[in-house]
């Protein structure tokens, strides 16, 4: 394993496929990076020299990838939520944002498009108490007495 900008990259993979382990780099961008640094298609990560590794890390550090890209995406979503636009409300409700149907195939969007909530819920000591017969018995007696008075 080689660590480039804090990301573990597999030694055995070709460079163009190893670059895919970075969040924000897809196939097209990986091909573009390899072409810019003149890496051939079969060049593996373990075959890179120190000079090539430093130029690669310098090129990657100039791009918006990994944590910076995640922060930017989350800031964009929170901006949409704060201005209360249609797309922001779709994110809040966990529905598809880009106009997809909601009748059938919105299960994935309902899982992924939720805005993370940071609210915490505390339980009172009474609600954390295990339910036992001694706990339920007074309630059951009062219910039976009410039923007895009705009939």
From Swiss-Prot:
Zinc in keyword set: no
Keywords of this entry: Mitochondrion, Ribonucleoprotein, Ribosomal protein, RNA-binding, rRNA-binding
Its localization reads: Mitochondrion
GO terms classed as biological process: mitochondrial translation
Q: Where is the major localization of this protein?
A: mitochondrion
Protein's UniProt keywords contain Transmembrane: no
- A cellular-component GO term for this protein: small ribosomal subunit
Query: Could you state a single Gene Ontology molecular function term?
Result: rRNA binding
Which interval of the chain is the signal sequence? Answer: none
Q: Which domain of life is it from?
A: Eukaryota
The record describes the protein's role as: Component of the mitochondrial ribosome (mitoribosome), a dedicated translation machinery responsible for the synthesis of mitochondrial genome-encoded proteins, including at least some of the essential transmembrane subunits of the mitochondrial respiratory chain. The mitoribosomes are attached to the mitochondrial inner membrane and translation products are cotranslationally integrated into the membrane.
Which proteins does it associate with, and in what oligomeric form? Answer: Component of the mitochondrial small ribosomal subunit (mt-SSU). Mature yeast 74S mitochondrial ribosomes consist of a small (37S) and a large (54S) subunit. The 37S small subunit contains a 15S ribosomal RNA (15S mt-rRNA) and at least 32 different proteins. The 54S large subunit contains a 21S rRNA (21S mt-rRNA) and at least 45 different proteins.
* Family named by the database record: Belongs to the universal ribosomal protein uS13 family.
Identify this protein by name: Small ribosomal subunit protein uS13m
Species of origin reads Schizosaccharomyces pombe (strain 972 / ATCC 24843)
Phylogenetic lineage: Eukaryota, Fungi, Dikarya, Ascomycota, Taphrinomycotina
Gene (name only): sws2
């Amino acid at each position: 394993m080689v660590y480039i900008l804090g990301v573990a990259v597999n030694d055995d993979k070709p460079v163009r496929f190893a670059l895919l382990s970075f969040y924000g780099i897809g196939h097209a961008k990986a091909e573009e990076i390899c072409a810019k640094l003149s890496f051939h298609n079969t060049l593996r990560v373990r075959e890179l020299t120190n000079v090539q590794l430093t130029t690669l890390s310098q090129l990657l550090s100039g791009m918006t990838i990994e944590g910076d890209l995640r922060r930017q995406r989350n800031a964009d979503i929170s901006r949409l939520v704060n201005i209360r636009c249609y797309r922001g409300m779709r994110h809040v409700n966990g529905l598809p944002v880009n106009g997809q149907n909601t009748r059938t195939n919105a299960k994935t969007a309902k899982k992924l498009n939720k805005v993370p909530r940071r609210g915490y819920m505390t339980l009172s000591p009474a609600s954390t108490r295990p339910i036992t017969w001694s706990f339920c018995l007074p309630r059951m007696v009062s219910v039976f007495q009410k039923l007895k008075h009705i009939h």
